[in-house]
Amino acid sequence: MMRIALFLLTNLAVMLVFGLVLSLTGIQSSSVQGLMIMAGLFGFGGAFVSLLMSKWMALRSVGGEVIERPRNETEYWLLETVRRQSQQVGIAMPQVAIYQAPDINAFATGARRDASLVAVSTGLLQNMSRDEAEAVIAHEISHVANGDMVTMTLIQGVVNTFVIFISRLIAQIAAGFLSGDRDGESNSPGNPMVYFAVSMVLELVFGILASIITMWFSRHREFHADAGSAKLVGREKMIAALQRLKTSYEPQEAGSMMAFCINGKSKTFSELFMSHPPLDKRIEALRSGQYLK
């Protein structure tokens, strides 16, 4: 949940910075078409910047260490498991990292299917059986194979575009109204302070509301990743892994952008703002075979 939240906050920060630069430099769009083009460039730009930086940010945020050569039997097993599953789904071998954390957790990130990263916590390796850990790894490999990183980036780009467009359109109307240009015929954006204040507040508010859409897609992809894991290692192993997660506690380590975690418990947000479905729903979906068809 933290990783997705930070990805959204990064996009929001990029939009706010772009908006600040435009307002300070006096660059404003005088037409709806121009505003839409600007919103698209900045909206998708923020999302793709986050995607391109995702591996670096992920490793930096959790203090992960990429395994170059296995130093013990656990690291050897982890590399071989990732290699075998990658071959099964037809993707290049991802980088594999381990990070120090007591929580049972793992994530996948990266800009491309064939240039990805899979990281697991020491808590996962210490507290899960090999079968359960294998299922979690298969879940992350399924995220990569399904192209979920790029899918979520495109969705975020569309959401960003509409947030910027609607916010600045309303801000331009409000600024023009207060400056006496109630017909919107002037090329001037109106009162620049009003324009800046309204656009920044609306981008923040609409960005938070738009995260509901992004979170819905994220939850949808989690069901498919669970199903992908079940196909790779067996349904019972994935169910066992999720049941083990029910006994774990909420992960607290710092997050990273565009990462897909296995641990989806949440105690502080309603389901609308959850990046993962409740664990009971994920287990039920696996038992019913809803996403295995």
From Swiss-Prot:
CDD domains: M48B_HtpX_like. GO terms for biological process: proteolysis. Keywords: Cell inner membrane, Cell membrane, Hydrolase, Membrane, Metal-binding, Metalloprotease, Protease, Stress response, Transmembrane, Transmembrane helix, Zinc. It is found in: Cell inner membrane. The active site is at 140. The chain crosses the membrane at residues 4-24, 34-54, 158-178, 193-213. Its EC number is 3.4.24.-. Zn(2+) binds at residues 139, 143, 222. NCBIfam families: PRK05457.1. This is Protease HtpX. It comes from Yersinia pestis (strain Pestoides F).
